[in-house]
Amino acid sequence: MEGHRKVELSEALALGPDWRHACHALLYAPDPRKLFGRIPMRFAVLMQMRFDGRLGFPGGFVDAQDSCLEDGLNRELREELGEAMSAFRVERSDYRSSHIAARPRVVAHFYAKRLTLEQLQAVEARAPQAKDHGLEVLGLVRVPLYVLRDGEGGLPAFLENSFIGAAREQLLEALQDLKLLDPGIIAKLKIPDSK
């Protein structure tokens, strides 16, 4: 979404019928484990490798038969992540933000859903059996929420990847607002320009 800008949900929902709505969700869970026995994981955060080679969040376009944004999002999550998604539902209370882009005329709505680590691991385990696995979705990845001693490995290296639309900005905003990442780490990050 070139030239995307953030808008309020009410403004996004008031746009005319020539606008398409897409919904995506950051799924996360507390993770008490430590990498190599010393680097706290804090949280597990899922993203996916998309068919176009970019990183993004699971979700997709809301269809005419979907009664609301969240129905469309939950349908897309089941298609992309499989039946483990039936154990919970992303609701309006999980809504975070909306971004619009004039070309194409798309509104991207962003949600964040907290799961248990067991629920998140079930999603990861069953995703390869999902309808869209190997097609729209090439695989799931966890976001490394740490910085290695060299100052480049972990999250800084992850952010160098190519992200779709506003996904990088949505990720960083959610990490900060949901307190999934130590604030000191965010302050030290060199955020690459959107690719």
From Swiss-Prot:
Binds 3 or 4 divalent metal cations. Acts specifically on U8 snoRNA with magnesium as cofactor. Has broad substrate specificity with bound manganese or cobalt (in vitro). Disulfide bonds: none annotated. Mn(2+) 1 binds at G59, E80. Pfam families: Nudt16-like (PF22327). One of its GO terms (molecular function) is protein homodimerization activity. RNA-binding and decapping enzyme that catalyzes the cleavage of the cap structure of snoRNAs and mRNAs in a metal-dependent manner. Part of the U8 snoRNP complex that is required for the accumulation of mature 5.8S and 28S rRNA. Has diphosphatase activity and removes m7G and/or m227G caps from U8 snoRNA and leaves a 5'monophosphate on the RNA. Also catalyzes the cleavage of the cap structure on mRNAs. Does not hydrolyze cap analog structures like 7-methylguanosine nucleoside triphosphate (m7GpppG). Also hydrolysis m7G- and m227G U3-capped RNAs but with less efficiencies. This is U8 snoRNA-decapping enzyme.
